[in-house]
Amino acid sequence: MAFKLPNLPYAYDALEPYIDQRTMEFHHDKHHNTYVTKLNATVEGTELEHQSLADMIANLDKVPEAMRMSVRNNGGGHFNHSLFWEILSPNSEEKGGVIDDIKAQWGTLDEFKNEFANKATTLFGSGWTWLVVNNGKLEIVTTPNQDNPLTEGKTPILLFDVWEHAYYLKYQNKRPDYMTAFWNIVNWKKVDELYQAAK
């Protein structure tokens, strides 16, 4: 069964003014779609074609070596972006059990945001910043390229795309401005659902 590009759960312009329509169109229709196309070309006709993407990424060492790099890059790109679209929303409300536990662990939501933003804005090159559940505890981690915390046995619940294609049309080289804007469109309801399932 071929992997498919998911539809966005909102209109292309729904995240304005924080992420502009043109960026969303390029990011979803071009960049994400390319990962899906290349992933399908890699796994077509193999046993991986019938495996879940999460299992593939979590067990990357079991993927045949000839396909491993493509699954890591293109499978990671597909998984990461699919989750990224889900944790964004034009209706962002900072509430839920995950917010309570963030405050309990970091002291305040602002302290958490500051640490997350520092890791995101200082990440060299392209990659992702994540809030993960690791042995029942929340942790902020970064990964290069399209790598995913699942490979390290950690469950992602919130992620921030630090690739330039995610923000350059609107923010150019101002990654901190893009990071600040991100907090206005986080779908905390979805993040909390992922958190409760991962605990």
UniProtKB/Swiss-Prot annotation:
Gene3D superfamilies hit by this protein: Fe,Mn superoxide dismutase (SOD) domain (1.10.287.990), Iron/manganese superoxide dismutase, C-terminal domain (3.55.40.20)
Residues annotated for Fe(3+) binding in this entry: 27, 81, 161, 165
GO terms for cellular component: cytoplasm
Cofactor dependency: Mn(2+); Fe(3+)
Similarity-based family: Belongs to the iron/manganese superoxide dismutase family.
Disulfide bridge positions per record: none
GO terms of molecular function: metal ion binding; superoxide dismutase activity
Keywords of the record: Iron, Manganese, Metal-binding, Oxidoreductase, Stress response
Lineage: Bacteria, Bacillati, Bacillota, Bacilli, Bacillales
Reported function: Destroys superoxide anion radicals which are normally produced within the cells and which are toxic to biological systems. Catalyzes the dismutation of superoxide anion radicals into O2 and H2O2 by successive reduction and oxidation of the transition metal ion at the active site.
Protein name: Superoxide dismutase [Mn/Fe] 2
Cross-referenced PROSITE patterns: SOD_MN
